[in-house]
Amino acid sequence: MSRVAALLAILLAASAAAAAALIILPAPSKSLAFVAIAAGEKSVFILALAVVGAVLALFASRPGTRLLAMLAVLLCLAATVVALVPFAQALRVASEQRVDLNFSRYLRSHIDTEGPIKAKKTVVFAELPQQGGTRSLGMDVYVPSGTLRPAPPAEPSRAIVVAHGGGWSAGDRGDASLASQWFADHGFTVFDVEYRTSPQPNWKGATGDVKCAIGWIKRHATTPDWNIDPGRITLLGRSAGGHLALLAAYAPNDARLPSSCPEGSGPDTSVESVVAYYAPTDLVWGYEHPVRKQVYDSSEKLRKFIGGTPETTGDLYRVLSPTERATAAAPRTLLIHGGRDQFVGRQHLDMLADKLHAVAVPYETLIIPYAQHGFDFVFGGLSGQIAEAVVLR
């Protein structure tokens, strides 16, 4: 019986140690990089697994199983120490940012997938001509519920326009529906927009679709259906969507990046502020310095998105780089990044922050040391809670 308990303890200890290793070591593959997101954001469960394994190992320690039990205890101790690191770092950042964390919500945190959200509506904002017919572009709209931050009914709400991630070639609106609903619960009207991810190269269409959505929202802002303040629109994007958000915000009236709406963008597509989660900002640098090619080949992603390399289409890489487009006229900017991002290096945040500082644009950065790329998709995780609170300010 003690031998079975010792083997079970080893199994639990090895599982905890393997999960903990993904917190501090580079992932060997893309699939394990996604597992690393959950490992870092749910590290308290690794801690629990390690504690159970250690207790079981001590219970099973007998002359014939002592070596196995000792090995299990050592693995559990190592996993415990590592599992505490992202938790402690999140507490430190929350304290620095004056964010009150909800630990009950943390224990209930889970992957943000689209579910039955009653407050959501879907509207078509563009009908684009394409071979064989037209292509409809839609946006999911989350209306303010007033659940957590009530506002007077007659007061126009602020709006958040969301551009999803997916390497410019995948993803869709609704990828972070719970986060969108959370912002709506806090008084925002949230528009989660669709943009074209194919065929590639699609740099012009994707950027133009985001601008088209902004123009549509501004045209309809004061209608009874929405009652939005058109001067208080925040553009928010994640990963590739963060790049598109920055580009649309920094070059609202650039003829090289026009709105894709058949009737034009209509109103000026400028926004009050822009928020970019773990976004590529210097595309030449990103092409030349992929973080981990076996996890995410940013060079190939950029080549397909733009239709060439920096050697063949260098001017276009610069036109599409937010670091090159930021001027004194750029809107207030919030840049958010995880320190352990294995898809988009944190250097992208640093380079854009330096440029914004140089041109005197109001900006803020939020770096969460042990957070991975896509950390906020663990809805309710500590890193996600910190980011939400900072965006809400």
Feature map (PLM): residue ranges:
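N-terminal cap/lid segment of alpha/beta-hydrolase-fold proteins
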Residues: 22-48, 93-153
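Catalytic nucleophile-loop/oxyanion-hole region of alpha/beta-hydrolase
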Residues: 42, 171-180, 191-232, 378-386
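Short beta-strand element of the alpha/beta-hydrolase
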Residues: 152-166
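Catalytic histidine neighborhood in serine/cysteine hydrolases
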Residues: 357-374
